[in-house]
């Protein structure tokens, strides 16, 4: 049986994922400036490189400090990414937002995995990761549909403002 502390991690991961919609919106944002079509892949590359570079040091740090503190730092970085992307006035500033998004991913994704592993009994670890990923995927779908609706019916800026606000609510819940 999966204990209450596991379900708290699942809930935290689900709420965090609701605050972080698909990276496709990074491509849309950087492409909104009528710049070269190469900016879209550049945004994903930037996010991925920063994510990859940050993941290992964040993992080392997670082994030494409270995971909740590292998740909180990751949420602060995502709020900053949303702010930069909301205020972006050029592909360069949108690219900076994508870099911050990657840093957020590096600070949070491995930590969440470690928290799942640490709260699930060994005999149920595969099932625990399956449930965690199922709910995270469902929340990412919901978040992305909502972000798309905001993008289309309100504005691209509103998408990132609401994303940042949801991150703030998640951060308050974490503290």
Residue ranges of predicted features:
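Juxtamembrane intracellular "pre-TM" segments in multi-pass secondary transporters
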Residues: 1-10
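Loop-to-transmembrane helix entry/capping segments in MFS-fold secondary transporters
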Residues: 37-38, 122-132
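Residue-level signature of mid-helix packing/kink "hotspots" within the transmembrane helices
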Residues: 48-56, 137-141
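Structural signature of the two symmetry-related core transmembrane helices
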Residues: 69-84, 164
